[in-house]
Amino acid sequence: MDKQEKNGKYILGIDQGGTKTAAAVMREDGFIVGCATTKGAYFPNEGVENALEQMAAAAEGAVNNAGIGKEEIAYTVAGVGGIDWTGDDMMIRDALRERLSLGEIFACNDAVIAFYSGALRSHGAVICAGTGMNGALIDKNGRQFVYGDYMEEKAQGGSALAK
């Protein structure tokens, strides 16, 4: 992609789980122009600071790989494992805004992002079994219900399912 195609309206997506943190920069038409991956961090166990450090590194890598400046990011969406309780989303959003110096940020549990990435309709449910396990249900009115952090870690995730 050459520099003339850039219109200053990019979306930054961040996906953080226990194994990895991935970030992608895309144009408004969905074409991905830059990606980066760093270590994972589950903030309820490893701390918010560590999670933010990994998200910032992945985001900055994706922006650099896209060949744009942070000021060209119009909107950021972060799907973060561990956003399970009321207020977690706002806490992560505010911390990301401060760390990355970006404006519009939406943060939610990564299962919500997983649901919308494959949904054929606006409501339904998804279960995600990665390093950990969580799920989300979105009802016909758009209300989100997240299930996560209710089980012992050794009893959840893909490795527990394989036992």
Language-model regions: role of each:
Residues 1-7, 102-126:
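Conserved phosphate-binding catalytic cores of ATP/NTP-utilizing and phosphoryl-transfer enzymes
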Residues 94-99, 128, 138, 143:
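Active-site phosphate-binding/coordination module
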Residues 53, 57, 94, 113, ...:
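Residues on a specific face of well-ordered alpha-helices
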Residues 47, 123, 134-163:
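Glycine/GP-enriched mid-protein hinge/lid loop-to-helix segment characteristic of carbohydrate kinases
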Residues 7-53, 57, 143-145, 150-151:
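Short glycine-rich, Thr/Ser-proximal phosphate-binding strand/loop in the N-terminal lobe
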Residues 21-26, 116, 127, 133-138:
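Short beta-strand scaffold segments in enzyme catalytic cores
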Residues 11-15, 73-77, 124-128:
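Short glycine-aspartate micro-motif
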Residues 59, 63-99, 118-119:
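Short beta-strand-loop/turn "lid" adjacent to the catalytic site in phosphate-handling enzymes
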